[in-house]
């Protein structure tokens, strides 16, 4: 079914750029592309989530869900947590592997502040995903294979901490 949908949409000028998104050339959703490339975002408003990267850490924020509690806190985060090193590989790949074209390998260092080989498990898990035919590591990018996109949950699970 997915193949048929992709073919029909392509005939209409809509190309698949993400596991569940299609767009005309140059019309991809920049908002979602920011998430898929592990970009930062501010959580503004009751119940909002945010992600902020610093040179040596990544911080997740959650605002109070109840509007009264949010207003009482004057918009301050109700919860902040640092993304641990073992979670980084999963969080990065959870999003990046959704993109049909994959993500530039340099984006890993740019967003995490570490080389691929510095992560305790990433190279091992990349190898596992490749050996199962679910992804490829090209000279310039990580990319899910067609099978990897079909079995995206299985591919993402390989990177669980």
Where are these regions (language model features)?
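Short, amphipathic alpha-helical interaction segments positioned at domain boundaries
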Residues: 147-161
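C-terminal scaffold of the Radical SAM
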Residues: 1-114
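Minor-groove-contacting beta-hairpin "wing" of winged helix-turn-helix DNA-binding domains
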Residues: 141-146
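A short, conserved structural fragment
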Residues: 130-140
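Short amphipathic alpha-helical interaction segments
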Residues: 115-130
């Amino acid at each position: 079914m997915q193949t048929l949908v992709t073919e029909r949409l392509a005939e209409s000028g809509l190309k698949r750029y993400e596991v569940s998104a299609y767009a005309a050339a140059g019309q991809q959703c920049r908002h979602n592309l920011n998430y898929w490339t592990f970009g930062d975002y501010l959580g503004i408003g009751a119940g909002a989530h945010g992600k902020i990267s610093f040179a040596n850490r990544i911080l997740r924020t959650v605002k109070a869900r109840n509007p009264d509690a949010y207003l009482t806190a004057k918009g301050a985060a109700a919860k902040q947590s640092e993304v641990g090193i073992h979670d980084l590989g999963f969080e990065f790949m959870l999003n990046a592997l959704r993109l049909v074209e994959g993500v530039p390998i340099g984006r890993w260092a740019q967003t995490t502040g570490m080389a691929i080989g510095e992560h305790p498990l990433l190279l091992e898990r990349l190898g596992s995903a490749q050996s199962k035919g679910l992804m490829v590591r090209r000279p310039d990018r990580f990319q899910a294979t067609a099978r990897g996109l079909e079995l995206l949950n299985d591919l993402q699970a390989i990177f669980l901490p």
